[in-house]
């Protein structure tokens, strides 16, 4: 049976607005830092501004690299395309796939990642799951909870029921 489907991540209006507003604020701050950098003479201030510009750049590249763009599932496994890079979860490593809602996560705490900029992406933690990787661009959509032998993933997906049904039917 040939199984290969692809869906795009759908952003909620909250994620869209958070991303737009934060991008504008960061861009204005970045322009201000660069403008101040160009017009600053004392070496100590130039060094401090250089460090701030470098840190802001690294944080922005990291935040953007986490943003998921599409999800593909096939007989080999589940593939998450991101703006920079991708994640592959092989079928053989998947122990279970279930459909959950965001409310079932009981307000997970962010350990390292984005709390709304481009989605809720990165490492999160809650009492029930422990540490897990989350790629959620819409808290109101159904979520896939994928558990492997060493990791847990929570992924927003409009096709969560279909993916769960197909993988569970394949006797994983």
Language-model features, listed with the residues they occupy:
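Non-transmembrane, membrane-adjacent beta-strand/coil modules in membrane-associated proteins
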Residues: 10-13, 81-149
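Non-cytosolic head/periplasmic domains of membrane-anchored proteins
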Residues: 144, 150-172
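Hydrophobic alpha-helical transmembrane segments
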Residues: 41-53
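N-terminal membrane-targeting/pre-transmembrane regions
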Residues: 1-44, 151
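Conserved beta-hairpin
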Residues: 56-98
């Amino acid at each position: 049976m040939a199984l290969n489907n692809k869906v795009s991540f759908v952003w909620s209006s909250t994620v869209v607005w958070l991303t737009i507003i934060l991008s504008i604020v960061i861009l204005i701050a970045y322009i201000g830092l660069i403008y101040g950098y160009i017009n600053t003479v004392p070496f100590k201030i130039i060094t401090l501004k250089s460090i701030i510009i470098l840190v802001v750049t690294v944080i922005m590249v990291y935040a953007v690299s986490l943003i998921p763009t599409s999800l593909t599932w096939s007989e080999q496994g589940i593939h998450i395309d991101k703006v920079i890079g991708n994640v592959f979860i092989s079928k053989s490593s998947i122990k279970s796939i279930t459909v959950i809602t965001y409310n079932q996560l009981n307000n997970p705490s962010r350990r390292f990642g984005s709390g709304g900029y481009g989605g809720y992406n990165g490492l999160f933690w809650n009492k029930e799951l422990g540490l897990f990787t989350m790629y959620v661009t819409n808290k109101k959509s159904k979520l896939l909870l994928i558990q492997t032998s060493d990791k847990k993933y929570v992924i927003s997906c409009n096709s969560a029921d279909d993916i769960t049904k197909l993988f569970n039917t394949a006797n994983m």
